[in-house]
Swiss-Prot record:
Protein name: Pyridoxine/pyridoxamine 5'-phosphate oxidase
Cofactor details (free text): Binds 1 FMN per subunit.
Gene designation per UniProt: pdxH
Catalytic activity: pyridoxamine 5'-phosphate + O2 + H2O = pyridoxal 5'-phosphate + H2O2 + NH4(+); pyridoxine 5'-phosphate + O2 = pyridoxal 5'-phosphate + H2O2
Organism for this UniProt entry: Vibrio cholerae serotype O1 (strain ATCC 39541 / Classical Ogawa 395 / O395)
Keyword terms, alphabetized: Flavoprotein, FMN, Oxidoreductase, Pyridoxine biosynthesis
EC number: 1.4.3.5
Amino acid sequence: MDLSDIRREYIHGGLRRKDLQANPIDQFNLWLQQAIDANLSDPTAMTVATVDEHGQPFQRIVLLKNVDDVGFVFYTNLGSRKAQHIAHNNKISLHFPWHPLERQVHITGVAEKLTAMENMKYFMSRPKESQIAAIASHQSSRISARGVLEGKYLELKQKFANGEIPVPSFWGGYRIRPESLEFWQGGEHRLHDRFLYSRQDDNWTVDRLAP
């Protein structure tokens, strides 16, 4: 398979320093809203990268569930591989690929667990089917067949048919406190625009990077 000729030109225009927000969270929210307004598929989907105790990196796609001045939030099974990695090394990176807009955002930061109240508030807002699925699946554990998972789901669906589903102790969220955010905009002739926000105490510095 020859992939050498698969390429395209970037046509959506550049990114200039004068167009940037002073706060990178504001810049992120601006781009995220534009991705939503453009009807991109899964605009909140992000790659989460972690590292195990041997230094082996792993990536997976999860959905961003909140962003504010403190950080970026996602939820997962606390027994999952990513949660085990975070327990060992809470440095993490996130990546948002908004290909149709010729944009991407790369974030580095530190993960911290959400409070029980934050977990409960979000869990109770989920559809009941999603709540059941969170309990039925012990994420990253080995199972013999899909039928085992489906059987557990149906069992729990019947069990909680007429009542509230308690928040499982092995489920919760993380907030990523950002230390850097890089905004990438595709440019003509591969002269892409890259701006890196780096946290300095309570302030942010902004540097242009070569493509």
